[in-house]
Amino acid sequence: MVRSFPSDGWSALPTRFGFWPENPTTAGVVSSRVFSARLPEVCRQVHDKQPFGMFKGENGMNYTFSTFLIEAILIIFFIKIVYVLLRPLRQPRIVCEIIGGMMIGPSMLGRNRNFNYYLFPPIANYICANIGLMGFFYFFFLTAAKTDVAEIFKAPRKHKYIAAVSVLVPIACVGSTGAALKHKMDIRLQKPSSIGGVTFALGFTSFPVIYTVLRDMNLLNSEIGKFAMSVTLLGDMVGVYVLVLFEAMAQADGGGGAYSVIWFLISAAIMAACLLLVVKRSFEWIVAKTPEGGLVNQNYIVNILMGVLVSCFLTDMFGMAIAVGPIWLGLVVPHGPPLGSTLAIRSETFVNEFLMPFSFALVGQKTNVNLISKETWPKQISPLIYMSIVGFVTKFVSSTGAALFFKVPTRDSLTLGLMMNLRGQIDILLYLHWIDKQMVGLPGYSVMVLYAIVVTGVTAPLISFLYDPTRPYRSSKRRTIQHTPQNTETGLVLAVTDHDTFSGLITFLDFAYPTKTSPFSVFAIQLVELEGRAQPLFIAHDKKREEEYEEEEEPAERMGSRRVDQVQSAFKLYQEKRSECVTMHAYTAHASKHNMYQNICELALTKKTAFILLPYQKERLQDAALTELRDSGMLSVNADVLAHTPCSVCIYYEKGRLKNAMVRSSMDPQHTTNSSHMRQEMYRFVVLFLGGADNREALHLADRMTENPFINLTVIRFLAHNHEGEDEREKKLDDGVVTWFWVKNESNARVSYKEVVVKNGAETLAAIQAMNVNDYDLWITGRREGINPKILEGLSTWSEDHQLGVIGDTVAGSVFASEGSVLVVQQQVRNQMGGDGFLNGKFDYKKLVSPWSHSHN
């Protein structure tokens, strides 16, 4: 169907191909009249051939296809330019896209007749408009396909109450305002269905909008982000059906009477039943037929994407909002792998980067700020503005007030109130739908688009200012290895991505020598990239609920969980073998790579661990240049953890003799705490002590290893010539720790200590290279804090990876030619402000429980 929207004060417009006449009869022109006699006619000139080229004297811009290509280039270009310009102002992508679309419309460049004449003639605009509508449909389908509807039933009661208050109060207030202003409204806006539609749009906050904005702001995995998505998802499930009721009212207002309303509701019910009973089961059959770990067959994906168009056709034919079909279809798609993730992988980039720009071009073409005038203000614009202001204020006050009532921290409550007012894609399409149903005119539509831009453009930076998801992770309390009392339990977070990384980190833990008197409490978290679902998922594996969870798990979720079974089995096996000296707590976090650090830091904060152990997974490709590197994805996670950690951090790069070594106990029978034994051979470890807090932390960790009878430890301390560049305070702290270490291990024949005096970084590097590097199985060093800059002078420019620090990167590099593994330590950076409450936005973890945190296993 060719959609053409009414235009106030429309008159025939001249184009290259003639006019848009009231009754076109010109030969060679095809006319299509849509909707009603008062609407403009869409005229298309027939071309029976393509241009031979500019060198033949022809103008390619006279042909529809050439014009369409230029339009596509300009649309995408303008949107990208606006995004680049506004991104430093912390504007979400949706705001940039709407403004980019407006640039080609009558509000900006479209005011120029030559611009329209050559670049955006009506003959090509109608093609762009239909592609734009398809972009909206597929966007809503993919977003709905990522949504786990089952989370609604698992949401805490508090979330349900807040969702109800944040929806009912604005609806009541906006509806009352609309009723009071009814006598001042335009005849189209006076209809009950029109007032109800506007009230509904201002009362509800759509889940796709919250999801996309929070994704742009990297807040999906934050506590308040999960909270907001839970609340909006609850409201959306009600809102979809309320929208159908308003559509039924519109059927009655359109003159169809009760007969058309009844058939409308019957059609909607039949479609919903078919989706639940037929389509959903077909999707489950596809999931069951897909091999474990594989992608869904391409033929199924094509058929599903074609089904989106079928759902659009049916809902449009029934008279419903055309977006309802894709949303309903997406909701019955099993989220996550394999089907949801395959749909996202195969189509998301094309939809977001190519189709959606046409969607915003459609929005921009219909937005005309020049129609906001004294003539249109009283009846078309002012009622919408008053209702919008009432909706914003009541939405903010009701959401914030309800959150405060349930003891949500003040800063988080204010942030939630702002999030509930965000506007985006589904709101814009709803405004277009109002024009289609003649609920508002173009002036009213333009005002609502500007309202969406202003509200989202202002609230998004305010959210960034009010809510910093990393702020709570900094602790004022000491959480380090150095300050953990001896002969007490040491807590640590173990972050793994697969079985290989787990094996390497466990090997290191055994070298760290947990015993009955000095055990480890390990919080092992497996990181899984979020695929095919919108909501992050954090699972705490509780043995008591293992059977219950497996029975409740959905088929699609079982398919997705098979990939983590191997790691979870390894967690369980290690716990059984080391039960006397290690307590293992297993978790799984499904999140995007940008947000994984939040799961790690939050776990370390709540469990009060002394350090976090991370794998270093950057390896050089075989037979490739030294600059060619493979990044497994953990590098960005490691960098974020180092920047926001609430405790100390250890990064372990396993290679050489320790790589894939079997974990067996090498402990003295008096200290044996399990039945697994490390290889009966001696290992040589070396600590490169350059001074500073990080190196002091590294030395304390190495001290734990001295208890292991199969480890020889060498400590080499580097000192600056004539004490140049030394910080007196750091020097005293270093002397104290080194003295303590030497006194404690003076009688230990497996521990040796050396001092090396150097003048600059070159001598430091030469001293390290002078060592027999292949004699050492593990190099231990601090990352950077407090190191005398004189010792590293000239080395910083050669460092490729700052995660490992200058020395760590040097000994880990291929140029150094060492086969030893590397351990780099960063001591906790304390939060000097300290305290909890409003100023630092401290989370209330016990009260603010995410609906995506489930206990099982």
UniProtKB/Swiss-Prot annotation:
It is found in: Membrane. GO terms for cellular component: membrane. Specifically expressed in pollen. Pfam families: CHX17_2nd, Na_H_Exchanger. It is a multi-pass membrane protein. May operate as a cation/H(+) antiporter. This is Cation/H(+) antiporter 25. It comes from Arabidopsis thaliana (Mouse-ear cress).
